[in-house]
Amino acid sequence: MPSDVVAAVDQTAASTLLGAAEAALGTLTKTGSGSLGPLGASYSASASFSGGTVALSPPDTIAIDNLQIDYSLGLTLSVDLSFLDFCIPQICIWTPFGDICTPKICFDFPTISVTVPFASSATLSADFGLKVHLTSGDWYVDVVIESVPALDLGAAAVLLLAAIGSAISAALLAVPFIGPLLSIAVAVITAAFGLADVTGLLGPIVSAFVAGLTFTVYKQPQNFQVLPALPPYNPAVMVSLAAVSADVQATDKNELVLSVDI
Amino acid sequence: MSLTGTHHAFASIDERGVNRALQAFFGARPHYLHYGSVPFVTSDSTTETLVQTIAFPGVPGGIAYAIDLTIPTTDLYPPDGALPPPLVLGPDQLSLTTEATITIGCTAGQSADGKRGQVMPVSTSLDVIAIGHPVSVYFSPGVGYVRFQLDQVLVENVAPPSLQAVLDCLLEMILSAVLSSVELPFNIIDVDFFKLILEAGPTIADNQIEIWGDVS
Amino acid sequence: MTALDSRVIGIGSCFAHRFSSPGTLQYSLSPLPSALTTGADRASSYSVTVSADRNDRPPRQYVTVRQANGRLVASPARLEITAGDIVVWSADRTVPFGFRVRGTIGSNVLDSAALVTESIYTHAFGLAGSFEWADANGSDLRGQVTVAMPDAAEGHERWLARIGEGALVHVRGVSAEPADLQIVVGQTVVWAVEDAPGVTITDASLIGIGGSAASAGR
């Protein structure tokens, strides 16, 4: 039996709806930990989505090409500098009052935390499926990613590697007595990990935002308000959205169709 | 043929949906169906509307009356069945049927049972059929509504024809006034799927009201 | 790593004094430069006894200051030396900020925060930069130490050899020779103070005079 209400959009309007859904999703955040070669790493990351071109494909697929993910990362690396431990030997020097010798002074280098801020973007193309559900009294039509595509993070990994190197150098400069050991320290530390390690750290962080990516293109309460209350004698007019379905229908145009019984 | 056609967005509500919307509207705001003067209605409320008595010289306090309507039922083009002549339901039209009960307060001296000095209600119920068409009012993307404008009203089974003409006109005025308060906002036609920029419609075909446009 | 400030002797710094005449120094330790007064000398816990006899004692002796149970402790608490010997006070890693030595020997006051004569302050520089120093007690004494990064081409071994060489600044009165000194990171500068009016060797930025331009702190 046909539905009481039918609302449809073509691919052009579907792109508009998707853009609104991307904006409504806002900024997602995640925290976690991993490793960068031998270095411990913890991070807080955020991501938002925008853009993309929509292709509707029956019966229920929405392909989005070139969806942009803008992400930022606050990476904290734990760097153990104990390999630099050394001692200033006893020095003996003539003074007008006689020779003086200072005691030997040994320095243990600490484990330092290096914070690396980083931001970049990537694009992805993927198929999304339609999922209609009634949850906590609200009807949802969600567009849900069907599989996580491979993300091209090569260029970003190169930039992140450089940013890590710069951050480590800057952090080391503040460690007393590191001065002449700085180049040794930087060389040893940065040799401990490479581009593959950075990619191995960055990839799962960004992919975590893409896995299960869901845009809500429709959300309305089942108890749907047609007209608001107009005091003193006009209560709100409500209807119940008894059933909701969504699909992609193909005729001379492919359209995203929402069907509702009230 | 696509639903959106040369536009980017489409929305429709079928006959059953319109009737459910009218039931919801008049169910929440029954005062649009019940009108009366004292003593039938003493004050405005959500259930009834107070009107003035009909002033007439020599009738103390005027002629008391009440008008009660049942929730109208619509039939969208094409018609589900034949309409009584001369009514014809054409494309982009809908018919509305309702039962109108007209009551007057008959003061004793005019009443049939001979009691003097009391106001006795005297009622008659009439089947009313009207033909109308939808009109859109658009303000901004997603903000607007469809209302109904009557083209013709017929009160069935009234004689002589002159009385029918009087009642047709009376009920047309009353129904037009009632329907002027009835709005089908865009958000029930598209269930708020999008903010519609209206470009075409409303039209009535295939037992549904249809509108087209773009989204913002 | 402590700042360049003879008022607070911390890791990488030393205070030393040559005791020319026999006598006994009664002294106290303080974590703060201003905490010790003449009155506190009466409760002095530590001593250096200077005698005329050598008795096979070495000419340089060392006092290590450590932190124990919230207090500064000198070890050894009592030292016996020969006139002409130098005593070197230094902190170990338990001392969080540094210490001040103040006491009296006869009618003379010995104070690491007010260097007079035959007193020495040493400081190892851990960071590159330009460090202007001055007297926190208000005299015109001042100078500059420029600390450079070692030449990478010279190699790590050459640098380790260089930091075994100290650099001397001879302070006479309120004049320093040399007033400007160039060293590399890790080297120790030794200020030998003679006939001064009770001076300090203090980073000028700590006392609001001019400033130091360390490349990454001090």
Task: Place the predicted regions along the sequence by residue.
Chain B
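Amphipathic hydrophobic-ligand
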Residues: G114-I131
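Extended lipid/amphipathic-ligand handling interfaces
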Residues: P85, V128-F139
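Tubular lipid-binding modules of the TULIP superfamily
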Residues: M1-D113, G142-S216
